UniProtKB/Swiss-Prot annotation:
Residues 14-47 are annotated as: Disordered. Interacts with MPC. Expressed in roots, leaves, stems, flowers and siliques. Detected in flowers only in growing organs: gynoecium, petals, stamenal filaments, anther walls and ovules. It comes from Arabidopsis thaliana. This is Polyadenylate-binding protein-interacting protein 12. It comes from the Eukaryota. It holds the Pfam family RRM_1. The keyword Glycoprotein does not apply. It is found in: Nucleus.
């Protein structure tokens, strides 16, 4: 049985989309000022010590101590990664071997990444909604710009790569707050935005540009936009709804001339049986969006390959849904 629903004007739409990508801008560092202030503060202390020692032995003891301190500091590695206890880490990917690692779907990626002894990426926490506060209409311009500096734009993403796998590639370079993949109607590949908790993680992630993920090397650049937040009331509330999300896709740029049956038959002929279909639109937009829930999760994964396919007169955009398709009081159509 398949349930098809259509919602007309004045309907609330999932706020899970992305701000359209644009050519990236350079990211500036704000660390030099703090470093300079620390240096100036330290010189005053050293001068006081130097005067005191010079009065006692002509400054030889002070010079000797400074040479020993300089020798100790010279042996430190300023680029060393923070030590993370093994109890706080768990493998993101497996199969690490000789600079290569296999993601869950069998793809292979290459690169030099910081890893633990068991071959997993070194990280603090898995990515999610923790960390920095998400943007909302009241977010100040300064906060918005700060979020953008913590975000990178990733292009040329293989259709079979999931958000979890993409985040797993970047999580070794900083804590990931959010990862959002979107389909590109003009390409068989996709693009994404990844937000880190700090600017250091975003700058370090730029080194991953050119890394093989799936069958294509990804491109990583600073972002000019930030990830649009998802309305928390739409997010899955139970384990059953999370399972529903795994079987659901979010489809945009749908030709208004297409009927519900047209869309259902298209996805069933290419991907698998459709359990529920909901279309949303109004009179003000030239296209519609839809949520397609399949009977099997494998069908939803296969549907991601349809992004960019011409359906009617427009190429559709397909991405994984972050929200389940919840039942209305009375479905308009039921198809067996």
């Amino acid at each position: 049985m398949a349930v098809i629903e259509s919602v007309g004007a004045n309907t609330t739409v999932e706020a899970g989309g992305l701000i359209s990508p644009s050519p990236p801008s350079s990211v500036t560092s704000q660390e030099s000022g703090a470093s300079s202030n620390n240096d100036h503060g330290g010189n005053g202390i050293h001068d006081e010590i130097g005067v005191h020692v010079a009065r006692s032995d002509g400054g030889e003891s002070f010079k000797r101590d400074m040479r020993e301190l300089h020798e100790l500091l010279s042996k430190l590695n300023p680029m060393a990664k923070e030590f993370i206890p093994p109890s706080l880490t768990k493998p993101v990917v497996n199969g690490f071997n000789g600079g290569f690692f296999a993601v869950n779907n069998g793809f292979v990626a290459a690169g030099n990444f910081p890893v633990n002894e068991d071959g997993s990426f070194r990280r603090k926490k898995s990515f999610g909604q923790q960390g920095k506060r998400r943007m909302n209409p009241r977010t100040s311009l300064a906060q918005r710009e700060e979020i953008i500096r913590r975000t990178v734009y990733v292009s040329d993403i293989d259709q079979q790569v999931t958000e979890e796998q993409l985040a797993g590639l970047f999580i070794g370079f900083g804590q990931v707050v959010d990862c959002r993949i979107c389909g590109d109607p003009n390409s068989v590949l996709r693009f994404a935005f990844i937000e880190f908790t700090d600017e250091v993680g975003a700058r370090t992630a730029l080194n991953l540009s050119g890394t093989m993920l799936g069958f294509y090397p990804v491109k990583v650049m600073p972002s000019k936009t930030a990830i649009a937040p998802v309305n928390p009331t739409f997010l899955p509330r139970t384990e059953d709804e999370r399972e529903m999300c795994a079987r659901t896709i979010y489809c945009t740029n749908i030709d208004k001339k297409l009927t519900q049956t047209d869309i259902k038959l298209f996805f069933e002929s290419v991907c698998g049986e459709v359990y529920r279909l909901r279309l949303l639109g109004d009179y003000h937009h030239p296209t519609r969006i839809g949520f397609v829930e399949f009977v099997m999760a494998e069908s939803a994964i296969a549907a991601l390959n349809c992004s960019g396919v011409l359906l009617g007169s427009l190429p559709i955009r397909v991405s994984p849904s972050k929200t389940p398709v919840r039942s209305r009081a009375i479905p308009r159509h039921q198809m067996h």
